[in-house]
Amino acid sequence: MEAIANLHDPLSGVVVVLLADFLRQHQGWGWLRLVAGATPYKEVPGLTMVKVMGSGHGGGFSLRPSATHQGLICTFTHLDLALQFLDSPAVQAYRSRARECWSGVMAVQSARGHWDKQAWQASSAQSLGETGQDAAQAPGPFAVLTRASIVPTKAMAFWRYAPAAQADLDQSPGCLLAMGLGEAPLVRQCTFSLWQDQQAMREYAFQGSHQTAITAAYKNDFFSESLFVHMQVLGMSGQWMGKDFGDDLGMDAVQTKLAANSSEQEAAHV
């Protein structure tokens, strides 16, 4: 794993997310992944960050932990290295042991905040390859990653808002996928969600129970650190919660999407 030279320099590159719901006979294998953490990935080319995380019951936001659900979030210096990882034995090991597994590669459009004192920034043209431009607004599937370190003495106050926010998320018509993740029980939490477009995400984020929870979090200083990341989905593969998301994680498919998005952005400025 490539070292980050300076924590004061924002982390830039391409994001990979993998979600797994392990078969019962492979729960032990999944547990060992959590125990090992980042250690097995130290030699992965281009990898700059990796988080192996558990989840709440059913893959949701419950205080009750799931014995089968798990998530992997990684950042890479370059798109081709991210795709190489998604085709590696390490990822195939997850897929072969899972009842359902979803994986995706994404370009960061915008980011605010920090994760382990490290800021993030938009994916550069260099990280996306020769046909890529700096990540910008684009049509199609849109992903959101949020994470927070919750002040321990305020954890229970924060969690009182979770059930209503999840209920609204489950009922949101534009949400294609959502999973609650955690680095540590109660106090280091993360959410990954996939949306049909940005408008659908905004309709959920800025009204109802979610807006109430966010307002309370800032008013009461629930977080000691937080990060909010908006991402363009470049490719995804697998099944989740009974939905089939296809398989377009090949380099040709991803580069075709990047080229199409670049053409649409150029046309919009004519």
PLM regions: where:
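Secondary-structure boundary/capping residues
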Residues: 50, 91-94, 223
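Short cationic amphipathic helices and targeting signals
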Residues: 69-75, 191-193
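Aromatic- and glycine-enriched beta-alpha-beta binding-site module
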Residues: 75-77, 91
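A common structural junction motif
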Residues: 89-97, 211-214
